[in-house]
């Protein structure tokens, strides 16, 4: 297998994928400002080699999945679409947990309908506990069991997790085979270092989101200086660092701009020297 690919479920995917969240309107709510541009971005992503798209029917809600269907259906055999359940949107655009059996079942069927599929490639259980802004401890057995039952019914091929703790990952793996874990992780926030290494050992994908999220001004300045020295953007350096961090890391940077999409995809060709990696590794301690 190429170092630029990794197995997600039963398919080999390019490690630099695409996150569709920004295709919806402002605040990931409502329709995009320009639907034609959103469709163009998706088609360009595939033309640039993307075969792993991350989405959810609670983006919009419904909007992002409908745009994906309009842009890409019928889907290429090598395309893996990963979606999420476990949350819903309030009328005021708020993010709310949706963990009851009925809500989880409805979410799977909404994803199927709006994507135009009979079975979903990968469904991540998005866990919203505590304040909902980061992983918090609590059992996910009941919710994951509902998802596993839908897998047994043939509605879902593979199961993943999102916004989870190591304890929840261990709990989930006793209930179902887990093919990916999606958490916030970047150069500045490395709480999942041990988790990434453990998942890599077991051949499980790790999908970080917010590659530039939560940086302090000092951390941003260091990253910007490194990027300038390489003739690259901070986002390109952040993505390149993630690609070199571990072979099981799959990236899903999102954008609603073709120009930014092309910039992001160019990160795959950016090689970071040991000296640069050492500087970047120090950012989390600044």
Protein language model annotation of sequence segments:
Residues 78-91:
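A short, structured active-site edge motif that brings together acidic residues
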Residues 1-79, 285:
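N-terminal binding-site loop/beta-alpha segment at the start of enzyme catalytic domains
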Residues 50, 117-120, 156, 178:
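A structural motif
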Residues 112-133:
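Active-site groove signature of glycoside hydrolases
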Residues 31-45, 99-115, 165-170:
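Short, acidic/polar
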Residues 128-286:
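Beta/alpha (TIM)-barrel catalytic core signal, keyed to glycine-rich beta->alpha loops juxtaposed to Asp/Glu
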Residues 10, 69-80, 113-116, 173-175, ...:
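Acidic (Asp/Glu)-rich catalytic clusters
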